[in-house]
Amino acid sequence: IGKSTALSIIAGEKQPNFGDHEASGFQELAQRYKGTEAQAFFTALADEEINVALKPQHVDVIPDAYDGTVKALLQRVDERDAYDTVIDGLSLGHVESRNIDDLSGGELQRVAIAATVVKDADLYLFDEPTSYLDIKQRVEVSAFIRSLADEDHAVMVIEHDLIILDYLTDLVNVVYGESGAYGVVSMAETTKKGINTYLDGYLAEENVQFRKSSIEFEERSEKRYTKPDVITSWPAFTHEYDTFSLEAGTGTIYEDDIIGVLGENGIGKSTLMEVLSGEIAKDFDMDEVTMSHKPQHLDADDTLVRLYLDGAKQHKHTVID
């Protein structure tokens, strides 16, 4: 609905076209908002009097654009001698000598944030900065991003995690609309009010109902009263790599189970899933059961969605994490 597009315009990477499908430029934008703070901002942006740094949404494409170590990349884009600060603040010391292509999703995300922060900017924009991060890393990254804001610098963030949004921001703009068709940005509200407005689906000040029903978090009812059938189980096992070892205890999955696997990044959660699904060879037997596994990292190509899904149906163990 346009959140990333809006950030790209604020960053000066895209120019608004006002529905004419041709870029009209920031001067026209400034004229349309004459007498407002928006006019002052976009005039300064057009005159290059404001420096803006943007962390893009998709960090998985970084290895396609850059081949080298984390240290070399960050030192190349560092405009304010902040290398040591971002390495310490984002806990990147253990990966600074590694190649970009060898990083996990969470490590790539923090490197992308670091590459944005070392820019000499007045305004820092972060598009979904906590994707791929575990809970501990989300809190750490949020505190680091929040520390950037002072009397000379501002921060704007696109974030879907409402808890992190509450922790990170002072003001919130609610964006509503229809995916792929249009988007509307509300006026700014305090964070608490903005989050409640989003959950309610109704903008009182603008008298706009953008969702038919509110989002409510209900208490969970008690589960089963009868003992369900076992779907599958496994014994305790160990899986080792050259520099990493996963130790897993015995486990059982029953009908009607929804099981969460919770833990920090890089400690073997995906390996556990891959062993149980049969994608990694295991030295123990499990009850024969059909499994469907969505992997953590996706490789996009030009295959049509319908053809991809038709092909996936042909496999007993569907790999779609």
How would you name each of these model-derived features?
Residues A6, A112-A114, V141:
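Hydrophobic anchor residue at the start of the ABC signature
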Residues N99-L103, E107:
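Conserved ABC ATPase signature
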Residues R138-E151:
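Helical segment within the ABC ATPase nucleotide-binding domain
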